[in-house]
Amino acid sequence: MNYRELIKSGADPTDIQRFLADGEMTAITIRIPKNLRDSAKEAAELRGMSFSALVRAGLIQQLMKRD
C-alpha cells in the first residue's frame, strides 16, 4: 500500500503516521537558503533533536493533514 491508497482508504492518523515513519532510510539532497538551514539547525538543537529529525517531523506533519 502506498500513501495515496492509505489516504483514500480512510486510514486513521496513527496508521498514517506509522506508515510514514517506517521504511528504510534514504539519503536525499535538497537546496534551501543557508539562513533557513542554519535557523532550522538551531531550532532543532533547542528542541534536543537533529536537523534531519526536524525535517522528517515537518514532512510527517504536512502529510498527516487532511485537506
Regions found by a protein language model. Name each.
Residues 6, 41, 64-67:
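Short, positively charged interaction helices/loops
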